[in-house]
Amino acid sequence: MRLAGGVPIPDSTTNMTALKKFNEAFDEFHRRGWWFHIFPEACRWDMYKPLRPFQKGAFTMSYKYCKPLLPCVITYRERKGIFRLFGPKELPLLTVTIGEPIFPDTTQPRKAEVERLREVAHAQMVEMAGITHNPWPASWEGQ
């Protein structure tokens, strides 16, 4: 993951030193103008269509750095036509859908705005993925 420029997310409940280093790394990324790519579900489950509840980290960073969110959804599809000739037949093809930017309103209180960003992003991504019934809420908080 580090070779690809990834930074592991530390467990904030057990290692405050690691969390401090993590936040310092993102401050440096922001200073350099780098993009952040975060899976708000905290991990990715291949082939699982519903969107699980989102963690608040990506939305907190959007608010902290006053940067827009750009929702992206990865969906899978069966290999058909010419694509059946290339690659392992059991591996599906991927479709990446990019949504509309969501801008943080830093005039609002952080906690309320982070929750709004999470709700809007979750709803947009459910729609982008073509999910008609998603069994999961946008977050576990307040449930």
Label each residue range with its predicted role.
Residues 1-31:
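Membrane-interfacial amphipathic helices and adjacent loop/beta segments
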